[in-house]
């Protein structure tokens, strides 16, 4: 992903709102220790650009967890035309609580699992934490009912080959979004939360300004209920990320992204000193940050699921 607008601070006045009947079962089932362990395992695979051994090991891990948690597993495979030549791309989808109702609403939790084509780049946070937290979501979803069909989507080739200009970057998400549109399924998707770089020890999730505000408000509500408001939406920025292709086909979406990874300033990358640097290693990732984001996002899904039942 790439930052495309300067940071703007926000002063937030938050209050705790408690909804009647909130069970908390899904968000309480989230295991941050497992999310961190998965992050460590994925980072241990080394570099993970498409086609690499680390990339293939990550795919195998994802499929193994989806099989164990009894997800309906689908693949979205295609060959992307890139500045580097043709590249095989593999989006992986795990579906939970699928019913026979062809109009059953869908909610997507997504994150990319590839890393840059850059020698020595491990991407423990950028690519590692997002893939790992989805694996922990799979375990939380296993055996728990929701009215919505929940999709976990691991997008591939999110990273640009040269730069996020024209059609370079977001290859997997662009393909999947267009596929949903062509199949007439986009209206069934009530929303998408994209998770990116959410393992940062100094967690500070941006209010990404192209994202769907009403869904951001649900996240803010969930964070307030859990006492996590200070970690969310304290500044605004605009990010070109995997949520953008879904917005373009009419799917509400939020980029849940920590856009300040390490020291900020004119002499470093616009998203922080560790962004796209070989210093994006496991020591920069925090189990506490994974817990804050994981519990908040799953409580947000619960709140949305409850509201669907009231319609």
Listing of model-derived features with the role each one plays in the protein:
Residues 54, 79-81, 191, 200-311:
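Active-site-adjacent substrate-binding region
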Residues 25-59, 69, 114-115, 195, ...:
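N-terminal capping segment at the start of a domain
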Residues 37-97:
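A non-catalytic alpha/beta surface segment that caps or lines the substrate-entry region
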Residues 48-50, 79-82, 100, 113-117, ...:
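Solvent-exposed loop/turn segments at secondary-structure junctions
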Residues 29-36, 49-60, 124-132, 167-171, ...:
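Soluble non-cytosolic domains of exported or imported proteins
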Residues 93, 107-110, 151-154, 190-196, ...:
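Structural recognition of the beta-strand scaffold that forms the well-ordered cores
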């Amino acid at each position: 992903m790439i930052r495309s607008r300067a940071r703007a601070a926000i002063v937030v006045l938050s209050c705790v709102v408690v909804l009647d009947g909130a069970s908390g079962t899904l968000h309480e089932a989230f295991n941050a220790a497992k999310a961190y362990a998965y992050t460590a395992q994925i980072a241990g695979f080394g570099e993970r650009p498409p086609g690499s051994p680390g990339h293939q090991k990550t795919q195998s891990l994802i499929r193994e967890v989806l099989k164990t948690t009894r997800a309906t597993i689908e693949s979205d495979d295609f060959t992307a035309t890139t500045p580097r030549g043709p590249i095989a791309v593999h989006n992986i989808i795990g579906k939970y609580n699928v019913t026979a109702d062809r109009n059953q609403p869908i909610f997507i939790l997504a994150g990319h699992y590839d890393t840059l084509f850059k020698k020595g780049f491990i991407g423990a946070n950028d690519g590692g934490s997002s893939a790992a937290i989805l694996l922990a979501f799979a375990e939380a979803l296993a055996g728990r009912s929701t009215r919505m069909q929940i999709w976990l989507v691991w997008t591939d080739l999110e990273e640009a080959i040269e730069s996020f200009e024209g059609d370079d970057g977001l290859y997997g998400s662009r393909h999947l979004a267009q596929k949903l549109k062509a199949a007439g399924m986009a209206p069934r998707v009530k929303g998408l939360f994209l998770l990116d770089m959410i393992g940062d020890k100094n967690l500070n999730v941006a209010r990404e300004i192209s994202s769907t505000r009403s869904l951001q408000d649900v996240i803010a509500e969930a964070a307030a209920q859990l006492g996590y408001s200070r970690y969310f939406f304290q500044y605004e920025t605009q990010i070109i990320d995997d949520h953008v292709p879904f917005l373009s086909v009419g799917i509400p979406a939020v980029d849940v992204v920590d856009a300040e990874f390490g020291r900020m300033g004119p002499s470093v990358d616009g998203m922080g000193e560790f962004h796209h640097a070989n210093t994006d290693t496991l020591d920069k990732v925090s189990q506490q940050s994974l817990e804050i984001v994981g519990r908040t996002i799953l409580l947000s899904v619960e709140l949305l699921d409850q509201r669907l039942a009231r319609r």
